[in-house]
Each structure stands twice: as C-alpha cells, then as structure tokens.
Amino acid sequence: MREIRSVTAQYDNATLGDAAVEGLFSGMIAGISMAAYLGMVNLMMGESLLETFARFAVSDDATPLLGFLLHLGVSGVYGLVYGLLCRLIARRWISYPFLRLSVLMGCAYGLVLLILAQVVLLPGSASPLKEISLTHLLIAHLIYGAALGILTRTEENSLH
C-alpha cells in the first residue's frame, strides 16, 4: 500500500508540461509501431514501404519521407493530448495505473481516433489512406493505442 501512495505522490508532483512532453514522445514511438504494422500488411499485399509511407501525406506529389514525418508529427500531437488527458482526468479516479488498465485506456483512445478519422477527417478528403482496409486501420489504431498506454504508464512510473 505504501508503494502505491509513493507512486501516486510522485505522479502528483509531475507538471502538465511533463505529461505533455512524455505524451508527445510516447505518441511518436507508438506511431512508429502503427506505421510498422501498416507497412508489413501492405508489403504482404504487394505494396512497397515507400508507397505506404507516401499515403500518410495529403498531396499527390508527396514523398515517402514527408508522409512518414507527417505521420510521426500527428502521432506525437495525439500522444500529447493523451498524456494531458491522462494527467488531468483519468488519474483523478485511478490511484495506480495498472498495466491492463493502461492498455485498455490506450486502445479506447486509439478507437476514438479511428472513429474521428473515419467520420470527420477522411470523408471529405482525397486521402490515399481511404484505400487501406478498415480492418487494418482498426488493428493499426489499436496497436497505436496499446503502445501509447504502455509507454505513457512507463513514463509515469519513471517521473521521479
């Protein structure tokens, strides 16, 4: 019981800035895991990694590097938001971030991001991401969310 109080006290000493920065970097790492999954799936379907990464950019003349960097940037921003949400909301009613709960919260967040993309962001666009199967996008977002939940929990445990 003392260990839980100690971790909670350490967590309370962390600033919102700490949570934002840790969420940013965790989001970028989780974005790499998501891109790796989509890259492997598309390789098995005959598409090169360069073609896959170019899909992440919105213009027709996008380079794979630009697409990958844009994906990392968006993943980082979503991770930052997740880090802040966890700090401001979720940790108010969770005394200790158990691994299973962290993964579940991350997966729920990934699912929300997928719904946001499918309902708000992609319908009015000519994005090549719309050509990727919804099943694979779902799995990719769950991978992103699970990785984000694990990484954010790991970062919280190392705050001090």
Where are the regions a protein language model picked out?
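Juxtamembrane/disordered regions of integral membrane proteins
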Residues: 2-160
